[in-house]
Swiss-Prot record:
Domain of life: Eukaryota
GO-annotated molecular function: metal ion binding; ubiquinol-cytochrome-c reductase activity
Name used for this protein in its record: Cytochrome b
Further comment found in the protein's record: Heme 1 (or BL or b562) is low-potential and absorbs at about 562 nm, and heme 2 (or BH or b566) is high-potential and absorbs at about 566 nm.
Source species of the chain: Sturnira lilium
Pfam families reported for this sequence: Cytochrom_B_C, Cytochrome_B
GO biological process: mitochondrial electron transport, ubiquinol to cytochrome c
Top-level taxonomy: Eukaryota, Metazoa, Chordata, Craniata, Vertebrata
Length: 379
């Protein structure tokens, strides 16, 4: 008799995705981050659901409702900090996942890659709106500064900002709609994840060598299920350590001050995972130019497949490209550091240099290096 997992209409889909899926035998730990992101999304949706049961999206009570969750709700503090630090783990895994795709040439699967970019934007939007909900000082001023960037759009900018705010400033209407969208978007993300996986399973996974691995495949279960479970344990241990020992390590102390439109914090900055983009935004003196650079810093990923000039897919056997890749990582870390610093000398010039380098590496140096490597190998 045929196994039910191979015949049942629903179980068959799960079986073909998680059990009998043929996977390359050479996948390294860099291929763990997809499943880790799935776990992060699950944790965020669950903790977020329980938090939403106690949260009120009203300017008068939002801050107090978060305090109430931490003080009066059973394990409310745990839910709140798991959700806040879970977002940080989400972005760590997300950036490592994108980095893996860049390094090993996974972007040549264009549909999977483009859905991934959409997912990145959706997760960033969700995180931004979530940061506004506790209604602390940094929530309020972060929302004001970031939404105000849309006013740089010619002709419709000002009207667009007021339309998003639901008034003439960030207020009750803004908080209510941000809560609604923050609740809705993770489910849209979950749906996009399904599409992401659908396109991935059309082509099969890439592998570290970048060479087709059709003759050498192994079943996903038990080999990669056990490998993924080890990844889950490591990530959940790290998340637990962060939540239980230093839950406010990655947060901003200003967010423990209730939102006050009459008092601006000395340094307005987003959460750490947006600092690199924030640094690029601030490095351009022109408002519209800064906004364009901010959007392009992520959207540039969409043209990476077009800029792929190498005859090899992966960077595994391309030492010159590897050097450039790690330089790009260093530039991104520098931008993250600069984003959290005040706008003064020498941080301004460091930020501008790093911003120019970021675009230069991706748009010019990487394609040129790929062409050089082709010539070195007489291709």
């Amino acid at each position: 008799m045929t196994n039910i997992r191979k015949t049942h209409p629903l179980l068959k889909i799960i079986n073909n995705s998680l059990v009998d899926l043929p996977a390359p035998s050479s996948l390294s730990s860099w291929w763990n981050f997809g499943s880790l992101l799935g776990v992060c999304l699950g944790v965020q949706i669950l903790t977020g659901l329980f938090l939403a049961m106690h949260y009120t999206s009203d300017t008068a009570t939002a801050f107090n409702s978060v305090t109430h969750i931490c003080r009066d709700v059973n394990y409310g503090w745990l839910l709140r900090y798991l959700h806040a630090n879970g977002a940080s783990m989400f972005f760590i895994c997300l950036y490592l996942h994108v980095g893996r795709g860049l390094y090993y040439g996974s972007y040549t699967y264009s549909e999977t890659w483009n859905i991934g970019i959409l997912l990145l934007f959706a997760v960033m939007a969700t995180a931004f709106m979530g940061y506004v909900l506790p209604w602390g000082q940094m929530s309020f001023w972060g929302a004001t500064v970031i939404t105000n960037l849309l006013s740089a759009i010619p002709y419709i900018g000002t009207e667009l900002v007021q339309w998003i705010w639901g008034g003439f400033s960030v207020d009750k209407a803004t908080l209510t709609r941000f809560f609604a969208f923050h609740f809705l978007l993770p489910f849209i993300v979950a749906a996009l994840v399904m599409v992401h996986l659908l396109f991935l399973h059309e082509t099969g996974s890439n592998n570290p060598t970048g060479i087709p691995s059709d003759p050498d495949m192994i079943p996903f279960h038990p080999y990669y299920t056990i490998k993924d479970i080890l990844g889950f344990l490591i990530m959940l241990t790290a998340l637990s350590a962060l939540v239980l020992f230093s839950p406010d390590l990655l947060g901003d102390p200003d967010n423990y001050i209730p939102a006050n439109p009459l008092n601006t914090p000395p340094h307005i900055k987003p959460e750490w995972y947006f600092l690199f983009a924030y640094a690029i935004l601030r490095s351009i003196p022109n408002k519209l130019g800064g906004v364009l650079a901010l959007v392009l810093s992520i959207l540039i990923l969409a043209i990476i497949p077009i800029l792929h000039m190498s005859k090899q897919r992966s960077m595994m056997f391309r030492p010159l490209s590897q050097c450039l890749f790690w330089l790009l990582v260093a530039v991104l870390l520098t931008l993250t550091w600069i984003g959290g610093q005040p706008v003064e000398h020498p941080y301004i010039i460091i930020g501008q240099t790093a911003s120019v380098l970021y675009f230069l590496i991706l748009l010019v140096l990487m394609p040129l290096t790929s062409i050089t490597e082709n010539h070195l190998l007489k291709w």
